[in-house]
A protein has these predicted regions:
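Hydrophobic alpha-helical transmembrane segments
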Residues: 9-14, 52-53, 91-96, 135-139, ...
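Membrane-interfacial alpha-helical segments at the cytosolic side of multi-pass membrane proteins
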Residues: 154-165, 227-232
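Juxtamembrane helix-loop-helix connectors linking adjacent transmembrane helices
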Residues: 34-53, 75-145, 163, 233-236
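Hydrophobic core segments of transmembrane alpha-helices in multi-pass, intramembrane catalytic enzymes
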Residues: 58-62, 140, 193-201
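N-terminal, membrane-interfacial amphipathic/helix-forming hydrophobic leader that caps
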Residues: 1-82, 88, 223-236
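Functionally important transmembrane alpha-helices
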Residues: 22-31, 169-184, 188-236
Length: 236
């Protein structure tokens, strides 16, 4: 134990292990619980209940792995992952900026005749509502998911890649790119939007030193998306 962060290559490798480890355990658990056959694996992409459960399970496993990995450096997990409370001024200002940044592309999409609510969002919302899992889906999307993703991308990965103020934008860009690639269920336009928002979240992480701040901001973005889905569903 050296009290030094993992190297960049090790950080990337360990981060991927945590990410896919969590997803793998979630998949195996759901297959075991529900006896999903190969023919029904696609249900994991459209069934709101299964998506909700997978978020809970994957986040729990991924976070546990990240904590274990950080402890191997001899540094406390909270310190390593940037889990510090943000300043009130930073929270208010960044929340305002992120709210505008999240709403502007969706408004532009509607202006040009595109629906910002994807079929994936609509399908999981509809099925979760039908199965009585809607409150748990809201919690998964607005709270649990952002906590897991930010702990990985703006927490663990950012710490491993950010070594000095000079390489801040390298860390910000790398984490934003990886975060965007993790949203492969969306089209290229939305993935690009995720990347830009990732740059913004990374900047706030760098300036504030707080991953809790980016968790809250990520939650705001996902809340906007869920509200848009709610409106679209009730208009359908």
């Amino acid at each position: 134990m050296t009290n030094e962060p993992w190297g960049r290559s090790a950080t990337l490798g360990l981060g991927l292990i945590a990410l896919f480890g969590g997803q793998g355990v979630a998949l195996a658990t759901l297959v075991g619980w529900y006896g999903l056959s190969m023919a029904h694996w696609s249900d994991l992409l459209v069934d709101g209940r299964l998506v909700t459960l997978s978020v809970y399970i994957a986040t729990a496993v991924q976070t546990a792995l990240l904590v274990l990995m950080t402890l191997r450096t001899g540094t406390g997990a909270a310190s390593y992952l940037g889990l510090a409370l943000p300043r009130v001024r930073d929270l208010i200002l960044s929340a305002l900026i992120v709210t505008i940044a999240g709403a502007a592309p969706d408004g532009a999409s509607r202006l040009f005749g595109f629906n910002p609510v994807t079929q994936f969002q609509f399908d999981i919302y509809r099925s979760a509502r039908t199965e009585g899992w809607l409150p748990w889906l809201w919690l998964a999307i607005v709270v649990v998911g952002p906590t897991g993703e930010e702990t990985l991308f703006r927490g663990f990965l950012f710490r491993g890649w950010h070594r000095s103020p000079r390489d801040a934008w390298i860390a910000i860009t790398v984490t934003a790119s990886l975060w965007a690639l993790s949203h492969a269920q969306y089209n290229l336009y939305l993935i690009s939007q995720v990347f830009v928002l990732g740059l913004l979240l990374g900047w706030f992480r760098f300036k504030s030193g707080s991953t809790i701040l980016t968790i809250l901001l990520h939650g705001v973005l996902n809340l906007e998306a869920m509200l848009e889905t709610f409106v679209a569903f009730n208009r359908a």
